[in-house]
Amino acid sequence: MAAVMAAPEAVEAPSSLLLLVVGGECGCPGLLAYVMEELERGVRSWEDVDPAVCSLDEQLKAFVSRHSATFSSIVKGQRSLHHRGETLETLVLLNPSDKSLCDELRNLLMDPAPHKLLVLAGPCLEETGELLLQTGGFSAHHFLQVLGDKEVQDALASAPAAPALTVSCPTFGDWALLGPVPGLQLRLNPPAQLPASEGLRAFLEYVAESLEPPSPFELLEPPAAGGFLRLARPCCYVFPGGLGDAAFFAVNGFTVLVNGGSNPKSSFWKLVRHLDRVDAVLVTHAGADSLPGLNSLLRRKLAEREAAAGPQGQHEERLRRLLSPALGVVFLNAREAASRLRGGEDEAVCARSLLRSLGIAPLPLQRGPQPSCPTVLFEKLGVGRLELFVLHPPPGDPAAPACALLVWQPAAPGDKVVRVLFPGRTPPARLLDGLQRLQHLPCLRRPVVTTHDLEAPSRANSQDSLASRDSARKEPVRGTVGSIANRSTVRREPALATRDQKKDTRSGPTQPTARDTRRSGPGVVNTKPRVSQNGPRAPVLAAPLTAPVAECPGEAENILESERPPAPSPTLSPAQSPPPTAPGNSPERLSLSPLRPEPAPDASPSATTPTLTTPSLPAELGSPHSTEVDESLSVSFEQVLPAGDPGLSLPLRLARRSTSPHDVDLCLVSPCEFSHRKPPPPASPGSSDSSARSQERPPETPPTSVSESLPTLSDSDPVPVADSDDDAGSESAARDPPPTPRVPPPLPDVPGICMVDPEALPPRARQPLNTTNPSRSRKAPARPSSASATPRAATVAAKTKGPAGDRNRPLSARSEPADRPGRVPLTRKPSVPKTVPKMASATRLSSGPSGRPAPLAAGSPVYLDLAYLPGGGAGHLDQNFFLRVRALCYVISGQGQRQEEGLRAVLDALLAGKRQWDLDLQVTLIPTFDSAVMHRWYEETHAQHQALGIRVLGSGSLVSMQDEAFPACKVEF
């Protein structure tokens, strides 16, 4: 607590009057005027003041001159102003958190003073009257919760007479529903009766100075040190967005900010200020719960531009203050906010005005006639492709909330495809309808999908190996120049086509740009030159391109082929690309980000990202704040546990096919309401991911067939494109010589690719490839992963059960090979996902003789890695929702009154839906706010969690960066 009222026994003459004033921080001048009017109305409505006993005017003057100020060390920005006079005790809370306000309200109710006044004035929602605080909100529901506290009830019952409590609060919304309270004389919003006085005017002026909106540089402080953070592994930062939500999704080469939260002091700022660029901003819905945090960032960007044009100050200090990430494309639908603050401005109108001043044209999100055609946000050969699927709104309803699905397909065959859902306020029925249109996609039909799994059918349909592969690659690629105008891609980063050219690019000397000098501070790990993302730049590989957003499915279908870099030929070179186009010239055209040549991932994770995934000690129930943070306190679906503890079941990292050296406890949050057991420390926490893969890699085995000797492992190989580009490239195709037949040499082993040991397989499995796995095509080579391998002892046990048990396993588990001795120590459990069917699965993928998946029935489940639950009163979530939307990690966000009222039903629906899953998958639940409903549900259903494999994390996780911690939960995939 920032300030605690003294107990009545500690003073000789306790005050007969208590005054508690709560003022929320104002983000705009118009909002400040409304708050001051509410404060004056509340003080003048206190009819219990007897002028013969207490002179309110003199007591307020004494408060202004003699009060003591306390700054909270727990809640940064919260202040408490306290003064105790002869007859009046006054406490003013400025910019408090929800917990601080509830604690002070509890102290006010338990105080024996006979007359009390509570003034609640601050930014509040027009719909419900809920006050927006620094963290969370305060509504009539929270007021009744404090009144129902056992200690408060005992104090009211023991009082000789029922104390009088006057409450001045919003006159609209749910506050009008408050009724009589036993043991308390409650008066709600009485009319103003006291006259205006000089002391009241001085009191209001002093409070107004404390509530003035801070400057953008004070609200969003610059980092203490220079340098930029590089996020090399796919991850998602879950921020406590207050009444809304805020998230930050990142892959190697592209970052996406989703919403901004309700707090003007952006919860995501302490992370993004360490980045050189935010490539995309996605606003699922416009309102007071999602845009204030984003608008604060836009105001800072505009203030930076004005400061740069102003008088020159100290050069170093000026550069440090102007340090902020560049902004890429912004997706925003609504032109008016769905929810507003009383007395405040429309956040959606404000956001569009700020974007217009910055020269950024927001782009709408709308589902096309064929929702399976995504918008490619980012694609780079050798790295991967990030796709955006719009599930909602349908065509013709641009103002509706947006629902977006991000799918990351890495280039490495053994890496996991990451699927993250951001529904915003989309109604669950429409969300399920949008997912049903995508349920045929292979990446959504299994709990675990890798790039190798997605490419297997295309390789199975090819019989001509080299000849057909080369002809399919070279001829259509030359038509990509003519199809540039048909792209729907936000950002493209080509790579050179041959390995020799790649080596020359890495080893040759390059001249760093001016922006690279900012990467020399602490935390800068990637020291290779990169092209600046803000302002003029010197292109290294190619010039930036512009392309309009796809308006029809025909344009979206050409995304893939047009974005792949062409093969080197005399008629096509990167220097011949069209010139760049300014991003704000036309709202119908989408500006591609300038090219940033990213270096290939290094062998050691520590050399590519400063974040380390380390175990964290679980905190006790109700601990006040974190006592242990790391460079990146995270949640990782990746566990390697000792074999001697069969009773401990932790969620595993289902996605990676390569065994990871990191041992991470999923309970990596502090404070953590729900304590868990902590696994033993990792054997080699400093070892790299790639080195661990190479150590666990089986010995090289000669290919047993022609198809196995031709894996698509080279990032430099051109990729086949569709026939739609043949016409555009016919002229250049005639000038190129025909490809020379060649037999490629055997390629070195790559993580995620291994050969099957024939001796370790059951007798029935020692058959030709076309009969080993009946669910795959006969021509598909068996490429099981090395990450999910099991010890030989597990293979022997499988032999005794017979091959029937293998047929009952899902495809993702059936493709796991038997392990070789020495790959995984026998004293440790392998990182194998628990995907054993509980019953005969009707949702398992099946393939016909042609290798094509069988059509799915309506209502088939969709598997995701992380999914936010629809919030903001979007609709009721029943067990059918969790039966259809199966995610390894669910996020509950939005600490609003409507959210808490239906929270218990949502949590019970999760248990009921998870109980009907046919696959035994580990599920993690991440709430972004603390709730008594969540605590009570956890205590009552904890036994079911263990049986169903559900892990509930605490809501107080912290991430440390440059010796400063901020609330967030990092989920690594």
Swiss-Prot record:
Pfam families to which the protein is assigned, alphabetical: MAPB1_N, MBL_MAP1B
Principal location listed in the UniProt entry: nucleus
Positions of region (Necessary for association with actin): 875-973
Spans annotated as Necessary for the mitochondrial aggregation and genome destruction: 881-905
GO molecular function, one term: microtubule binding
Region span, Necessary for the microtubule-organizing center localization: 1-716
Keyword Protein transport: no
Gene Ontology biological-process entries: apoptotic process; brain development; metaphase chromosome alignment; microtubule anchoring at centrosome; microtubule bundle formation; microtubule cytoskeleton organization; mitotic spindle organization; nervous system development
Entries under InterPro entries matching the protein: MAP1, MAP1B/S_N, RibonucZ/Hydroxyglut_hydro
Region Necessary for association with microtubules, annotated ranges: 645-880
Gene Ontology CC annotation, any one: cytosol
Residue ranges, annotated region (Disordered): 452-538, 560-853
UniProt keywords, alphabetically: Apoptosis, Cytoplasm, Cytoskeleton, DNA-binding, Microtubule, Nucleus, Phosphoprotein
Keyword Cell cycle: no
Transmembrane stretches, start-end: none
Xref: SUPFAM superfamilies: Metallo-hydrolase/oxidoreductase
Tissue expression notes: Expressed in ventral and dorsal horns of the spinal cord, hippocampus, cerebral cortex, molecular, Purkinje and granular cell layers of the cerebellum and in dorsal root ganglia of the PNS (at protein level). Expressed in brain, testis, heart, lung, kidney and liver.
Biased composition (Basic and acidic residues): 490-506
Function recorded in the entry: Microtubule-associated protein that mediates aggregation of mitochondria resulting in cell death and genomic destruction (MAGD). Plays a role in anchoring the microtubule organizing center to the centrosomes. Binds to DNA. Plays a role in apoptosis. Involved in the formation of microtubule bundles.
Domains: entry comment: Its C-terminal part of the heavy chain interacts with ESR1. The N-terminus of the heavy chain associates with the C-terminus of the light chain to form the heterodimer complex.
Protein name: Microtubule-associated protein 1S
Biological source species: Mus musculus
Lineage: Eukaryota, Metazoa, Chordata, Craniata, Vertebrata
